[in-house]
Design a protein with these regions (language model features):
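A short linear boundary/processing microfeature
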Residues: 45, 64-67
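Short beta-strand element of Class I
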Residues: 47-49
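S-adenosyl-L-methionine
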Residues: 1-32, 37-38, 43
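Conserved SAM-binding loop
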Residues: 61
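Conserved SAM/SAH-binding beta-strand->alpha-helix loop
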Residues: 54
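Short alpha-helix immediately C-terminal to the canonical SAM-binding loop
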Residues: 58
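Short loop/helix-cap segments at secondary-structure boundaries that form the rim of catalytic
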Residues: 39-45, 168-172
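SAM-dependent nucleic-acid methyltransferase catalytic core
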Residues: 1-13, 21, 66-178, 182-191
Length: 192
């Protein structure tokens, strides 16, 4: 299963292992949602809530939940090539609306080496030694992936509050909380 976003600290590769170790639960809380790799890989719980303070993440998932906005975003992505110039422009552009904002967020996320919210970390390209240009393939798969992600989010409550407040609000016996806070910047490579 692929995630839509190449988010820092993504658990995409280890999500199956994490889910295998989760106890049975009625309600599920992910107070540090990021790219959502764990939620999108697990079976739905009766009540699910995700949270992220990053307005770009919240906007992206808000856009794909709305049919008209999702279709506009899919068209925007369908006609946006995998391009260094578009990637560089994504850091300079002032989006016209939430759909374009979500589109540029996707460009910055999926066309970069290691997406950072605060700046360019290099356009990702495949040169040799691989079966195909995976970066381009994942980019071209994105518009079609949005529909299943929107369907999965249809049953999910999306918050944008301090995580500790949500942890306190959801502190009940039948609630499973998947807590994966962001990395402390000083512990990341180069402090970035």
């Amino acid at each position: 299963m692929k995630t839509l976003l190449n988010y820092p600290g993504s658990k995409r590769r280890i999500a199956p292992w994490i889910i295998k170790h989760m106890p049975a639960h009625h309600s599920y809380l992910e107070p540090y949602f990021g790219g959502g790799s764990v939620l999108f890989a697990k079976r739905p719980a009766a009540i699910e809530t995700v949270n992220d303070l990053d307005g770009e993440v919240v906007n992206f998932f808000r856009v794909i939940r709305d049919l008209e906005s999702r279709e506009r975003l899919q068209e925007w992505l369908d006609y946006t090539p995998y391009s260094r110039q578009i990637y560089e422009d994504a850091f300079l552009m002032e989006p016209q609306d939430d759909v374009e904002r979500a589109g540029y967020f996707a460009v910055k996320s999926l066309q970069s080496h290691g997406f950072r919210m605060n700046g360019d970390c290099g356009w990702k390209k495949d040169v040799h030694g691989r079966e195909c240009a995976y970066a381009v393939r994942y980019w071209n798969d994105l518009p079609g992936s949005i529909a299943w992600m929107a369907a999965r989010l249809k049953r999910v409550q999306i918050e944008s509050r301090p995580a500790l407040d949500l942890i306190q609000d959801f502190n009940y016996e039948n609630v499973l909380m998947y807590l994966d806070p962001p990395f402390v910047l000083s512990t990341r490579s180069g402090g970035k």
